[in-house]
């Protein structure tokens, strides 16, 4: 099955049969501390750690159900949440022994911080 789906991920995953996908790539909003609301007004959450984890956890649970035993999941985050998500969510649901790689996507564009070093990378966890 070669398909790309762009919609409410949790609703979509809940309606999928179990064990059908070879690859899942999740790129959730980053935890910025702001109130986030989707374009359609669905799925509002406070972009803070506790809300972020409780918002992300069900997606990861459902992703495990629909992923084949031999499948791979990629979770794309930034430096604010990658380690929390790895230990508190991904290792718990997928198992630490299934961790494959921590991919660092480095780039050279973006703003320059006045009070700190600017982040010039994103993090992708692979299980």
Please state what every model-predicted region is.
Residues 1-127:
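Core catalytic lobe of class I
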């Amino acid at each position: 099955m070669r398909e790309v789906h762009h919609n409410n991920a949790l609703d979509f995953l809940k309606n999928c049969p179990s064990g059908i996908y070879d690859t899942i790539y999740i790129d959730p909003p980053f935890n910025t501390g702001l109130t986030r609301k989707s374009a359609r007004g669905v799925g509002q959450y406070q972009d803070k750690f506790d809300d972020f984890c409780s918002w992300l956890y069900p997606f990861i649970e459902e992703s495990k159900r629909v992923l084949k035993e031999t499948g791979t999941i990629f979770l794309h985050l930034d430096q604010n949440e990658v380690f929390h998500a790895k230990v508190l969510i991904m290792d718990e649901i997928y198992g630490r022994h299934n961790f494959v790689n921590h991919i660092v996507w480095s780039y050279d564009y973006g703003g320059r911080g006045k009070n700190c070093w600017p982040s010039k990378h994103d993090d992708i966890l692979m299980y």
